[in-house]
Swiss-Prot record:
Recorded family membership: Belongs to the NDK family.
KW Membrane (keyword) present: no
Major enzyme class: transferase
Gene: ndk
One Gene Ontology term of the molecular function aspect: metal ion binding
Location in the cell: Cytoplasm
Signal peptide range: none
Main location (coarse class): cytoplasm
UniProt name for this protein: Nucleoside diphosphate kinase
GO biological process entries: CTP biosynthetic process; GTP biosynthetic process; UTP biosynthetic process
Function (record text): Major role in the synthesis of nucleoside triphosphates other than ATP. The ATP gamma phosphate is transferred to the NDP beta phosphate via a ping-pong mechanism, using a phosphorylated active-site intermediate.
Keyword Kinase included in the entry's annotation: yes
């Protein structure tokens, strides 16, 4: 069964919409195989987003991701990567379709409520970043 990583970002955690977001996953056939609430260190955020290191938004992204706790989850289901990306909506909430997580809960392109793996290969890497195999059920 396909797995993907989801991060509920600090803006959505602060707003108290964790349960509403998790319900979207479960209501659409994604099972929560692992989950934890963590406060990322600057080093962890830099390592997780290392692929964006040379991009102009990197510093702001890292600062945002350490501004409060996040909820990381492993979602499992048929076509989990694409299904999660469809549920999240466009990166910019102004462009996200009505009814998507970002359209409903995101503030801006920076504070956009959620992160989701963009491929099966990255899902594997991202899941291993946060979870040991014995933490996924």
């Amino acid at each position: 069964m396909e797995k993907t990583l989801s991060i509920i970002k600090p803006d959505a955690v602060k707003k108290g919409v964790i349960g509403k977001i998790l319900d979207r996953f479960e209501s659409n056939g994604l099972r929560i195989a692992a989950m934890k609430k963590v406060q990322l260190s600057k080093e962890q955020a830099e390592n997780f987003y290392a692929v964006h290191k040379e991009r102009p938004f990197f510093k702001d992204l890292v600062e945002f991701m350490i501004s409060g706790p996040v909820v990381v989850s492993v979602l499992e289901g048929e076509g989990a990567v694409l299904k999660n990306r469809d549920l999240m909506g466009a990166t910019n909430p102004k462009e996200a379709k009505a009814g998507t997580i970002r359209a409903d809960f995101a503030e801006s392109i920076d504070a956009n409520a959620v992160h989701g793996s963009d491929s099966l290969e990255n899902a594997k890497i991202e899941i291993e970043f946060f979870f040991k195999p014995n933490e996924i059920y």
